[in-house]
UniProtKB/Swiss-Prot annotation:
It comes from Bos taurus. Pfam families: UPF0767 (PF15990). PANTHER family: SMALL INTEGRAL MEMBRANE PROTEIN 12 (PTHR28599:SF1). One of its GO terms (cellular component) is membrane. Keywords: Membrane, Transmembrane, Transmembrane helix. The keyword Transmembrane applies. Belongs to the SMIM12 family. It is a single-pass membrane protein. Disulfide bonds: none annotated. InterPro entries: UPF0767 (IPR031933). This is Small integral membrane protein 12. It comes from the Eukaryota. The chain crosses the membrane at residues 12-34. It is found in: Membrane.
Amino acid sequence: MWPVLWTVVRTYAPYVTFPVAFVVGAVGYHLEWFIRGKEPQPVEEEKSISERREDRKLDELLGKDHTQVVSLKDKLEFAPKAVLNRNRPEKN
């Protein structure tokens, strides 16, 4: 009897293996969910460095008064004239 059974199992192995694997997988899946219990609350993702930098820059911009700007004269006088005329020939 055993040799006949082993011959049948060997011949029809693909047809026998899949249902057995399916049942074992389904039982394991449900057993794991039963043991694990409820799903934990999702953890809030931490912001990346670039996102934190953008938030910080936006907060800085919100605190500034954008109607008060430096005049163009003040900006042009920032650089010393010696630097601007360094490579130009002197006019006499």
